């Protein structure tokens, strides 16, 4: 709250959502929308604000700014011009999802959102097919089933978890094999944004070696 109160401008994807937050805490600040479809047009204006000495608070609609978020473009541009940037720690879906998944958390890879079409998505997933690290993805509700189908085809029937509405009233984490999770979502259509956590390659072999030790 102190950061928002001290900022000269508040930047977010959806100023309506951020407006609810600001109004709730009676913080009156000018807002600028910075989205994937306007970032190249709005970025020069934001850089002008920063170069004039004004402070910008970057807020995300959900999660953490710059992670699977257009705010990354602004952060990179500011750093390129030696403008100081700091971050306010807060919850992020990928960390909560991997912790609650029940899968190994000592080493993991975050992939974020993948391609929308089957062919490119399967090739993108295949990049990590031999990786021993737990894999974390983000996916939208209307592509989740297709994503799980492609993941099952590429990775085989690995253990996985699908998390939704983390930190909210109806927080849900489903755990099981990819085929089991796929069946659940085919029966109960997905709603909301999802974090998908998939076991890395060779987890069973690692478990067996631990038992022998």
In which residue ranges do the predicted regions lie?
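Alpha-helix capping/helix-boundary segments
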Residues: 16-18, 63-64, 93, 143, ...
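Class I SAM-dependent methyltransferase SAM-binding "motif I" and its flanking Rossmann-like core
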Residues: 73-131
């Amino acid at each position: 709250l102190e950061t928002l109160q001290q900022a000269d401008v508040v930047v977010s994807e959806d100023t309506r959502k951020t407006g609810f937050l600001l109004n709730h805490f009676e913080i009156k600040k000018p807002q600028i929308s910075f989205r994937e479809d306007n970032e190249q047009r709005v970025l020069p204006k934001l850089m002008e604000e920063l170069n004039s000495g004004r402070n910008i608070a970057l807020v995300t609609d959900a999660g953490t700014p710059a992670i699977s978020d257009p705010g990354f473009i602004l952060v990179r541009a500011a750093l390129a011009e030696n403008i100081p940037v700091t971050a306010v720690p807060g919850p992020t879906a990928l960390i909560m999802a991997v912790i609650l998944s029940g899968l190994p958390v000592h080493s993991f890879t975050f992939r974020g959102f993948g391609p929308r079409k089957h062919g490119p998505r399967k090739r993108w997933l295949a990049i990590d097919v031999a990786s021993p690290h737990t894999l974390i993805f983000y996916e939208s509700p209307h592509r989740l089933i297709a994503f799980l189908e492609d993941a099952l085809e590429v990775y085989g029937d690995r253990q996985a978890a699908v998390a939704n509405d983390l930190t909210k009233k109806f927080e849900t984490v489903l755990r099981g094999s990819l085929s089991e999770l796929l069946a659940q979502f085919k029966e109960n259509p997905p709603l909301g944004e999802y974090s998908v956590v998939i076991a890395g390659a060779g987890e069973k072999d690692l478990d067996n070696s631990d038992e022998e030790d």
